[in-house]
């Protein structure tokens, strides 16, 4: 090898990627992992301070504070991102809220339900619709919806969260049918119980967020339409052969 030869940087495996819920947990880990692979990231989250801290860790991460519960602002958000970063080609809907409460708990109000439904379900639908014309104009693009094993069977203390993830899973399937034959891939990333601030104090045997992020990206690069991560890889078989067992396992997850 010529000692004076300058090694050319490898091309990024993915185009610029939007990651929602990037302030902490899986979203933060996704942003860092993607950036480490050379993928530019638009990191969206509500906590501007945490986002700036994240962006300071890698030059390829751009912090974009936004509250996705403000559904009426999502169209403008998508337009602003595309205007600033016209090379955006991947949208990962990771943001999520779970109130670990029963429906009859006195502290669980209508505003909590509205927030959960908006962030977990309505925002991904609205953001996808707003960004879709741009994505369809690219040679290759991808929408990734981060769902959960709870989309298959509900958790006792997370009725609304389980319902939103089931809705997001069905939306993923419907969108995939709509976009079949187009340049836009639609991917369902099914998560197990992951160690994040949202799951603090709940359950055992949680998958580290970094491992969850790496598995998601590996599945995405492998071209998979459904990525079952960690213990969630057992969900399809259990749902088919032992649905009662799966339901009992997830009720107290």
Where do the language-model regions lie?
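Conserved glycine-rich cofactor-binding loop
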Residues: 23-24
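Conserved glycine-rich Rossmann-like NAD(P)H-binding loop of the short-chain dehydrogenase/reductase
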Residues: 37-53
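Conserved mid-core segment of classical short-chain dehydrogenase/reductases
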Residues: 98-114, 157
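Residue(s) in the substrate-gating loop at a strand-loop-helix junction
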Residues: 148
